[in-house]
Amino acid sequence: MIKQLQHQAKMEFGTGDIGFNAGAIKEDDNKVGIIIFYNQEPRSIGDTGDIKEGTEVDINDFPVVMKFYRKESIDVVIKALLEAKKEMD
C-alpha cells in the first residue's frame, strides 16, 4: 500500500496491492526512464496490475513516480534492491 504521510510517501510491499509499470517518456528531446506506482486491490504478487502494459498514461496521475535520467541510476537502485533482498535471508 502506498501511504502519503506528512513528510514522505511510504510504500509497503508484500500483499500485491501496489501496481507498477515501467517505460520511458520524452523530456527536452531526451528519453527518461520511468516507473509509476499506484494502489490496487490485493492480488498474487507478480500478477498483472490494473494498468496493462502499453497503456498510455499521464504520469502526474500517480502518487509515486521514479524518473531516471541516466541508466547508471537504474543500476544503483537495482543494486540497493538486491542488497535489501539479501539482508532478508
Model-derived features: positions:
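Positively charged, low-complexity terminal tracts
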Residues: 1-89
